[in-house]
Amino acid sequence: MASKLDFENQKYYIDFASDNGLEYLELEPPWYGDEDGAINRPKEYDITKPVPEIQLPALFDYARSKNVRMFLWTHWENVNRQADVAFPLFAKWGAAGVKIDFMNRDDQEMVKWYHMILKKAAEHHLMVFFHGAYKPTGTQRTYPHLLTQEGVLGNEQNKVTYLCTLEHTMTLPFTRMLVGPMDFTPGGFRNVTVEQFRPDMNQPMVLGTRCHQLAMFVVYESPLMMVCDDPAAYRNQPGLEFIKNVPSSWDETKVIEGKI
């Protein structure tokens, strides 16, 4: 969930994660620069220089004291330019890994780039998940620290479009999910009907029931599951205990029934 990135604000998120047994927190932009610039003008930014307001080394120390580890969001162009310096620094800070975004290609050059970056991340014991990514092709078999990747129209689209329909979410297990883990970001708790739904950047809604969103944690495959809503949406709500207790991976899945 994107939010104001200063030290006190992120402590709030770390505390929520710790209180609810969530192992990881992802720092989105603008941890190293303003959000618009980090996304649209990556060449102007340096992912080894966090903004002062976040007090990043101290934030890592605080997260560690709460048994929460952090992933750092990065634009792929910055990673391409700075991985040799940034990855050892991220490891020194204590980062669990990186979320790399906005590749938006699957040509041969980019596929080779994925492999190169995964090798570099492995050298520094950093886990990886790709956003703005192409569909999986079995790469996680060679690089098990690749946890998941997007390549799917997920819940974030509810902020700006009407595209994440119930029909779409019910079809994914039979289509996109067949090729590998997908970072759909389930767990929206502002559940509404088709008639009530509207795109909302600040308090995104999701179509369908609470149970529909919770079922995604079981049916959708992703060893790293995101909890997509904000703490205020979850507190004292039915379903939070399920999210706290459901595992993200298991040894065997038995399909009882399912068809399109």
Which residues make up each language-model segment?
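Glycan-recognition and catalytic regions of carbohydrate-active enzymes
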Residues: 229-260
